[in-house]
């Protein structure tokens, strides 16, 4: 199928989701305008075989694997007592690995920068207005971007979701959070 799109597809958000969408579309020849500020990317990711298949479809599996640590198992311990609770052993035939979010972002940015049909604008969007023909995005500097298609990749508290759902307030904060951490094996 031939790409007949002439105006760029705007992607709001420059995190992992936004960059991945930009690479997928850009690799297919679509013009893409990626708008937003690069986010802070603390922490890490555990990648499963499905995750590596997704990265492979973007041409990034080898680049990510070069920066990742292969996992043979995941050990779950009680944080307060260091008591061993359980262990999940991974089948060696199926790749599991841990990698920092920043390393994933660096690989995504490097790949996106090789695609000439992807344009970056480093700005913060203040308003998203959905119209019948086009969407209008207004930056904090007053710049206006209009597009036939907008992909919202600015997170669950982002403007794209608020524009679609009509919710302008923040969602309630959960009482508990699940977290993953690395702790020295000697502790």
What kind of feature is each model-predicted range?
Residues 13-16, 37:
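Glycine-rich Rossmann-fold phosphate-binding loop(s) that bind the pyrophosphate
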Residues 2-9, 24, 48-165, 169-186:
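Conserved N-terminal helical subregion
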Residues 14, 44, 101:
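Charged, low-complexity surface patches
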Residues 16-17, 28:
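Mobile amphipathic helical/loop "lid" adjacent to a hydrophobic cofactor/ligand pocket
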Residues 26-43:
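Glycine-rich FAD pyrophosphate-binding loop
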Residues 17, 40, 157:
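Conserved Rossmann-like nucleotide-cofactor binding loop
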Residues 9-11, 32:
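Conserved hydrophobic helix-helix packing surfaces used for dimerization/oligomerization
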